[in-house]
Amino acid sequence: MAVPVAFFAVFFAYPVVAIVGRGLKADGVWQSGRIGEVLSRPDILGVLGFTTWQALASTALTLLIALPGAYVFARFDFPGKQLLRAVVTVPFVLPTVVVGTAFLALLGRGGFLDELAGVRLDTTVWAILLAHVFFNYAVVVRTVGGLWSQLDPRQEEAARVLGAGRFAAWRRVTLPALAPAVAAAALMVFLFTFTSFGVVQILGGPAYSTLEVEIYRQTAQLLDLPTAAVLTMVQFAAVGAVLAVHAWTVRRREAALKLVDPAQTARRPRGAGQRALLGGVLLTVLVLILLPLGVLVERSLDVPGGHGFDYYRALRSADASGGTFLVAPLEAIWNSLQYALVATVIALVVGGLAAAALTRRAGRLVRGFDALLMLPLGVSAVTVGFGFLITLDKPPLDLRTTWILVPLAQALVGVPFVVRTMLPVLRAVDGRLREAATVLGASPLRAWREVDLPLVRRALLVAAGFAFAVSLGEFGATVFIARPDNPTLPVAVARLLGRSGELNYGQAMALSTILMLVCAASLLLLERIRPDRSGEF
């Protein structure tokens, strides 16, 4: 437990507290009055209101669209089901910058819909909501569908035999069993959309600003640290509350249900109604998920005079006008891969130790630490990144000019995925096997190597894959700490989109396509090696 606690204390809590302190202290004295001053400003109230409203709207829309998909994946067996499950999960591991870029290519000026029907939705709230549904569709499908597939359908059939109608049986038997999973999925979707940054920044334009975008604007553009500090505290409180409720729903789901093998519940769709439902879900996946990704690829190949790889070839040289890149954009790929590999190793060590500690200990303190491990997914990455710059600049942690700063920030986001993936698998390992190895003379290290490691190896690979994918796409903190001569892929895409010109736009599409393909390949590989009990993600 000591290593994970120290890691989070130094590289998460310390930078965040330092930023808040820098903003709310004057001459060493806390200025609590600044909180009321900031929260009473009409512009800040507008940001808070829009952040909450769009998160609630995104959550409701995601549930409405994704719950039929959860049922189809849980109860139907059809050709290509595993591949389709991997496809719908791809958006979840995509960087938000790529998601924003894909929807910009679909809905923006000169985009697919603009050319097809003269319709533009960029800089509208609909673009933000649709992108959020695209991003979080898999959260509902996997969380709710994963539980739904393990519910014994004979219980609902028994209710119908006793006289209940189809809907009444579902409402009285299945819905109460699913409610904790639906609540957990809704809370996670709310968390991800409440803290949305890249999607809103790219698609929302100046008219729309969430808390995360406003923290970035107040910090990086206006240098108004008091306002940024107050907004960080508000976001921290909201995220903490959401995670506390989420932890309660997960415990309730684990404790209250008797589950069966998913292979026993999936059947071929029968009748016109079930086939229509399957067709509707397939159409939703095609339009909502595959179309934006396909348009992104097409726009990366759409060069003057036809289609070709001109934008990809242009990535090999630095910007001739000077100002966007000090190096060729293509080098961002190599930088990102290096950073992500180091971040993955860090996340595996810290997250693996944390999961092992949580498995072998119990109590309210341990449950609290489990919830704290999820905070980096919700607390402002912008705050963490800026906090790195102002705290890790003195011995013995003078890291501001070193390359390790980026992997450390990325690992913070990877650790929760490692913990959530490893924890159920480690809890399923029979401790008596380890005890027997110890009795036979094996040291604790050898017992772990000979007993635990073979049982959790596949889950460890899945955790590594998730950590690699999310590290590769981390943007909020990296945009602050990545050096101009060592940009990552998401930072390079954002810089290109920030400049006018057909070449810059095309290069942004090309880089986004490369990043999408790397993340998709990682996800498809994970689906092939994924064990049945490899966690919530």
How should these model regions be labeled?
Residues 32-37, 45, 80-81, 100-133, ...:
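Membrane-interfacial helix termini and adjacent extracytoplasmic/periplasmic loops
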Residues 1-5, 15, 42-54, 112-139, ...:
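Loop-to-helix entry region at the N-terminal start of transmembrane alpha-helices
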Residues 1-18, 82-88, 236, 240-244, ...:
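N-terminal signal-anchor/first transmembrane alpha helix
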